[in-house]
Amino acid sequence: MPFPFGKSHKSPADIVKNLKESMAVLEKQDISDKKAEKATEEVSKNLVAMKEILYGTNEKEPQTEAVAQLAQELYNSGLLGTLVADLQLIDFEGKKDVAQIFNNILRRQIGTRTPTVEYICTQQNILFMLLKGYESPEIALNCGIMLRECIRHEPLAKIILWSEQFYDFFRYVEMSTFDIASDAFATFKDLLTRHKLLSAEFLEQHYDRFFSEYEKLLHSENYVTKRQSLKLLGELLLDRHNFTIMTKYISKPENLKLMMNLLRDKSRNIQFEAFHVFKVFVANPNKTQPILDILLKNQTKLIEFLSKFQNDRTEDEQFNDEKTYLVKQIRDLKRAAQQEA
């Protein structure tokens, strides 16, 4: 009878046990270089063996029974959490292996069940350790890869959104290291757009706190953060699931004033993204009085400004149609005001 675990002849239980022991050695501060080197080697070897069980090799496909055993061993031993907690102690290639193992195990399904998602729901600290990974440059991008895989699953996205730690994203997207800030923004955007109903519920329940933090991003000194935040704001407001949030946002005069200022930003790209938020205020058929007052007060200036706004975008038909429509809407405001008078 052929041995089910291939060339290595190591069962999933052995691999997990060896890996856990080697990680425990690396966790000790006072070990000799020789011991650390040996433990690092063992960690690498066992991570590769684990990957072979999950992904198979050129010669053979992954075996369901071995994968199931490995997953169970990872849950029972707590090793999944240990690998995340000690990610900094693992070498460069090993960090990539951990992310691949984690994401593979996370995607695993039995019928309609996703056992690893259920497991992480009971071990929520794993999510928060991944999130905190953005504070450590050497593991930030690995943690981002695992975090986004978690967010694909609604129960895990909900845990993060409703946590206090979610608000750490407002710091992470402003980090000075471009790669890390961009990665954090990609994760932040995923959280707010992947599960539409969940995001809408979150934004409705936490509107004031979320948007007071979000406004700081729109004032950011960092061009990329400012532009990405403005673009995402436009997407959030125009998503039909967020109708209640959009209605509330475009009823506030301070938000309109901010967009009018951003229309005159020194960056053309920022101006362009601001235009896509500004148009929602103008196109709204049920404008609040404070919004109407601002538009009427600046009516002539706005018509003149929009008529000349980025006129070199001749190829962009939709933009030009929208601009023409906004000019007409703003021009017609006067008539509406006069008729009422």
UniProtKB/Swiss-Prot annotation:
Key word Cytoplasm present in the record? yes
GO BP terms: namely: cellular hypotonic response; intracellular signal transduction; negative regulation of potassium ion transmembrane transport
What is the organism of origin for this protein? Mus musculus
What InterPro entries does the annotation carry? ARM-like (IPR011989), ARM-type_fold (IPR016024), Mo25 (IPR013878)
Q: What does this protein do?
A: Component of a complex that binds and activates STK11/LKB1. In the complex, required to stabilize the interaction between CAB39/MO25 (CAB39/MO25alpha or CAB39L/MO25beta) and STK11/LKB1.
| Main localization category | cytoplasm
Q: How does it assemble?
A: Component of a trimeric complex composed of STK11/LKB1, STRAD (STRADA or STRADB) and CAB39/MO25 (CAB39/MO25alpha or CAB39L/MO25beta): the complex tethers STK11/LKB1 in the cytoplasm and stimulates its catalytic activity.
The protein's matches in Pfam families, at most eight in alphabetical order, are given as: Mo25
Coiled coil regions, renumbered to chain: none
Example GO CC term: the record gives: cytoplasm
Name of the protein described by the UniProt record: Calcium-binding protein 39
Q: Where in the cell is it found?
A: Cytoplasm
Q: What keywords is this UniProt entry annotated with?
A: Cytoplasm
Q: Which family does it belong to?
A: Belongs to the Mo25 family.
Domain of life where this protein originates: Eukaryota
GO MF terms, alphabetically ordered: calcium ion binding; protein kinase activator activity; protein serine/threonine kinase activator activity; protein serine/threonine kinase binding
Tell me the leader sequence span. Answer: none
Under the heading SUPFAM superfamilies, the entry gives: ARM repeat (SSF48371)
